[in-house]
Amino acid sequence: MEAGRSADEVLYHNQSSVKLGELERYVITYELYQGDSIPADITLDSLWVKIKNTTKLSYKPAYLLGPFILYCDVRAKDYESSYKIICSADKPVFQSNLQAQQKFIAELSLHHIKPRYVWIVDIVSQILFNKETKVTFEIVVGNSKASLKRKIRCNDSLPDKACNILHTGLSVHRLTTADIWKVPRPIDMSQKSHLVILTHGFQSNVSADMEYLMEEIYKAQMNNPNERLVIKGYMKNACETEKGIKFLGVGLANYIIDELYDDSVGKISFIGHSLGGLTQTFAICYIKTKYPYFFKKVEPINFISLASPLLGIATSTPNYVKMSLSMGIIGTTGQELGLKDGNYGDKPLLYLLSEESLISVLARFKRRTLYANAVNDGIVPLYSSSLLFLDYSQLLQKLGGQTTAPCDPLFQPEVSPIGELPNHSDVANDDDGINASSWNTFWKSKENNCDKKSKRLMNASVIKSMKSVLLSPCPDAKFFSDPDARVATIIHDKIYTEKNLPPPSPTLYEGTAAKEGETRKTRKEMEEIIARRWHKGMHWRKVVVLLKPDAHNNIIVRRRFSNAYGWPVVDHLVTAHFQRDDPIASPMQDKQFAEEDINMATGGVEPNKFYSWLTKIEDPSVYHGGIVSTASQLASSWISKHSSVTD
C-alpha cells in the first residue's frame, strides 16, 4: 500500500442536490506517481465511489412531486463508444433508476501502471413534473469498499456541505449544469458564431435530456475551424409542454432574438426532439414574420427533427388516447396533436404551420433532415415523424417482419421502391416516384380497424413507451465493449423531393379542416394535405432508424448509457450536419423557391393581420395545461408548506 495511505480511508465526500433538468459532474483525478521513475513501493489497490440518493423514503411514492430518482454513471475520461474494450475494468457502469435511500457503488480500478487516472461521474436528476422539488444525494470516494461505510460528519457551513478529506494525489473537480453547458472559449474572437438551438419534447428538458447530444456536437468543432459552434437551448419551457405549441414556440423565438442574437451570429441550426420539432417550426415561422431581418442576416443551415409528430398523432393512436387528447387531458398540446380545431379558426394549428408563405423559410435551410423510428416508438408514429411519404416496401425488407404493432399499416402496402442510397450523387439524380396504386393500397390500409388483440398490443405499446422514460431497457455489456457487435441502426437514408410523391386523389383538397362529427378519414386526409405542403418546393432527407426500446428517447440518447442504443443516430447526425459539406444540401429549386416573394395582397408585404394566429398575444387562459400540470401545481402548493423538499 502506498505510503501515507491508510486502510479504509475516506478520501472525498460531498453532499448536494439536483432539480429538474439539473446534473452534476465530478471529475476524479488520481496521481498514481509523479516523475519519470516508478516508485518501488507502488500499489494498484482500487479506489471506490459511492453515490447515495439521500431523499427521504417517504417521498418515494410522491410521483408528481418528482419522481425523486437519480441517474448516475461512472466512466474513464478517455472512454469512447467507438473503441473496443478488452479489459472488463475499463467498462463504464451506471444506474438509471437510483431510488430514495438507495446507493450505487462502483470500483475505480487501477489496473495499469501509469502516472494518472481520470474518471468522470455524472449524477442526473430524473424529476419530470415539478420545477421546485429536488433530489438530494451524497458522493463518497474511498480507498476501499469498506471505507464507504464509514460515517462522516460534515460542516454545514461549507458550500454544498462539502467535506473534502482529500488524500495526497487525489483531486475532485465538481461541475454544475451551468458549467457543463458553458460555451467553450473561442480561439479566435473574430470568428462568426454558428448558433445551434436544441429543443426538447413533451415532459422533457434541454439541460439534462439533450446534454449528450450537445457534447457530441461540440466535438465537431475541430472540423469547423472557420466558425464557432454555440449550442443553446431554451430552459424555461420545461414543465410547460402541455400549454401548446404556440406558447412553447413564442418563448423559444423570443429567447433567440432577445438573449442569443447579436452581430457575431452568422449561422443558425435547429435540432428538435419529439414535440420540439413542432416547437422549433413555430419559432422559425414566428421569427420570420415578426423579425423579418433575422434570416436576412443569419444563414439558416440545418433543420433537424428527431421522432417529431409533424403530422400530429390523430389517426394512429388507440381510441382512449384520442379521447384523452380531445378532452385536453394533456392540455392544449394534446388537442393540437389530435388535429382538433381550437383557438385559430376552422383549421388545426399543424395545418396553419404548413402555410406556403411560412414554410418557404424552410427552403432557405441548407439541409432539412427527418430522423424517424421504424419500430419501438409508441409515442410518435413513423408516418408522422417522416412526413408520411416513404419507400415502405424497402423498409419492410430491412425490418424482416418487425412492426410497431400487428395492425400497423405502414408495413402492409405494396410500394414500388424508389431506390437505395449508395451515395449522395445517386440520391440527387433520383427521379423515381412512389407508385400511385400502391400508395392507395397503403392509405386504404391505414383506415382498417385492428382486431381486439392488436388493439391491446397497440395500447400496451403506448403505455410501455411512457413507462420506459424512467425504466428504459438497457443494452448488455457487450454493446458497450464491442462496437462491432452492435446491430446496424440506420436502415433507410434517402432524399425525397416533391416529384417523388404520388399524385393526390381528385377529392383530396375538397375541404381543409376536420370539424366536429366528421369521420376519421377527414383527419387522415388532413395529414396527407399537411405532408404534401411540407414537401412543396423542397427536398427532405429522411433517415429511418431501427432502435430497441425505448426508441423514442434512445434516438437522442436521453441518458448516456441507459439510452445508448441511440449512439449511432447521434453519430450520424453530427457527421452528416457538422463534420462535412454536403454538395447536394441546397438544390437549385430550393434556393429559387426561397427567393420568391410571397405576394399577400399587398405587394409582397406580409402584414401581421394575415398571421394573427401566429403573432396575436393570447390571453394566458388559452394556454391551458392538462391533468399532469394541474396535479403538479397542487403538489407545489403542498410542498410550499414542506420546505425540506425544496430548500
Curated annotation (Swiss-Prot):
This is Putative lipase YDL109C. Its EC number is 3.1.-.-. Residues 502-523 are annotated as: Disordered. It comes from Saccharomyces cerevisiae (strain ATCC 204508 / S288c) (Baker's yeast). GO terms for molecular function: monoacylglycerol lipase activity. Keywords: Hydrolase, Lipid degradation, Lipid metabolism. Belongs to the putative lipase ROG1 family. The active site is at residue 274. It holds the Pfam family DUF676. Involved in lipid metabolism. Coiled coil: none annotated. Present with 195 molecules/cell in log phase SD medium. GO terms for biological process: lipid catabolic process; lipid metabolic process. Residues 513-523 have a biased composition (Basic and acidic residues).
